[in-house]
């Protein structure tokens, strides 16, 4: 159980990193937007789309079902909230707090699932030909998902006896701030 959860939590850390990178690039103020537009506008536009789609894919991945059919009646276990919840339940460790966080994570999934299924993971013909906008949601809903994700990891850590890990902030050497500094001629360009 502990190894499974630690591997799951690493996926959650990666989701946070992807979210932070996208936010730090594209939601950090006009000076940074102008710098991106003056250096490589096409690249940054494409990177924004890639990061959003990848974030949606990862958020759906951790909220997929506990197993996936692979043919001939066989299944593979998924490293997901549902799989961990099932393991916790079997051991009598599934608390109300963990259930509540699971429900919060799955509420967000409902908002983005069509985008994953019809545009990101599959090329749905109707979506491609009619330019249907899928997966739209408020920033507050994305932030709530991340909050549920952190609370879920903390609550599971507690019941299985794993040291909690705060991964709410993922910046460090070589991050977006250093990129903007390099693009800005060596001068630090803080978010606004």
Task: State what each model feature region is.
Residues 1-108, 135-192:
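Amphipathic alpha-helical interface segments
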Residues 102-130:
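Histidine-centered, metal-coordinating catalytic motifs and their short helical/loop contexts
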């Amino acid at each position: 159980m502990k190894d499974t959860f630690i591997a799951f939590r690493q996926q959650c850390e990666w989701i946070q990193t992807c979210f932070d990178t996208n936010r730090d690039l594209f939601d950090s103020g006009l000076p940074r937007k102008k710098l991106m537009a003056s250096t490589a506008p096409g690249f940054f536009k494409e990177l924004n789309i890639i990061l959003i789609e990848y974030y949606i894919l990862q958020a759906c991945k951790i909220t997929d079902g506990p197993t996936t059919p692979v043919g001939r009646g066989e299944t593979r276990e998924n490293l997901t909230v549902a799989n961990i919840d099932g393991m916790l339940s079997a051991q009598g460790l599934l608390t109300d707090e963990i259930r509540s966080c699971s429900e919060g994570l799955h509420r967000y999934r409902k908002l983005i699932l069509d985008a994953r299924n019809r545009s990101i993971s599959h090329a749905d013909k109707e979506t491609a030909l009619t330019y249907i906008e899928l997966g739209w949601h408020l920033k507050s809903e994305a932030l709530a998902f991340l909050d549920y994700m952190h609370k879920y990891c903390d609550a599971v850590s507690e019941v299985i006896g794993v040291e909690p890990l705060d991964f709410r902030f993922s910046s460090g050497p070589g991050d977006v701030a250093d990129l903007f500094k390099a693009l800005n001629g060596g001068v630090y360009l803080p978010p606004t």
